[in-house]
Amino acid sequence: MENGALQQGEGKDPSSFLSEIIGSKVIVKLNNSLVFKGELQSVDGYMNIALEKCEEWVHGKKKTVHGDAFVRGNNVMYISADESA
C-alpha cells in the first residue's frame, strides 16, 4: 500500500462485495470443480446462492443451460465477478 492508496479489493469484507454484485454476472466454482456462470440474484449468510440465466460448465466447456439454479453454500469454493460479461 503505497501513499495510503487502497489496492483493488482491499478494505472490503466479502458480504459487502457480494451485495454490490447482486444483479451482475458471476462465476461460481464448486468444491467438485463444476462451474456455474449466471446472474447473481441472492446470497445469504450461509453462501447459499440463487442464479438466473445460469450455465453449467465442465472442464471449460458449456454443458447445460439452466434457467434458475440454487447452490447450497457448503458446496461453494468461490464466487467471482464475471469480467468477460
From Swiss-Prot:
Domain Sm: 13-85
SMART domains: Sm (SM00651)
UniProt GO molecular function: RNA binding
A GO biological-process term: tRNA processing
Subcellular location(s) of the protein: Cytoplasm; Nucleus
Source organism, top-level taxon: Eukaryota
GO CC, any one term: U6 snRNP
Keyword annotations from UniProtKB, A to Z: Cytoplasm, mRNA processing, mRNA splicing, Nucleus, Ribonucleoprotein, RNA-binding, rRNA processing, Spliceosome, tRNA processing
Function: Component of LSm protein complexes, which are involved in RNA processing and may function in a chaperone-like manner, facilitating the efficient association of RNA processing factors with their substrates. Component of the cytoplasmic LSM1-LSM7 complex, which is thought to be involved in mRNA degradation by activating the decapping step in the 5'-to-3' mRNA decay pathway. Component of the nuclear LSM2-LSM8 complex, which is involved in splicing of nuclear mRNAs.
Subunit-structure text: Component of the heptameric LSM1-LSM7 complex, which consists of lsm1, lsm2, lsm3, lsm4, lsm5, lsm6 and lsm7. Component of the heptameric LSM2-LSM8 complex, which consists of lsm2, lsm3, lsm4, lsm5, lsm6, lsm7 and lsm8. The LSm subunits form a seven-membered ring structure with a doughnut shape.
Protein family (similarity comment): Belongs to the snRNP Sm proteins family. SmF/LSm6 subfamily.
Protein name in UniProt: U6 snRNA-associated Sm-like protein LSm6
Source species: Botryotinia fuckeliana (strain B05.10)
High-level lineage: Eukaryota, Fungi, Dikarya, Ascomycota, Pezizomycotina
Gene: lsm6
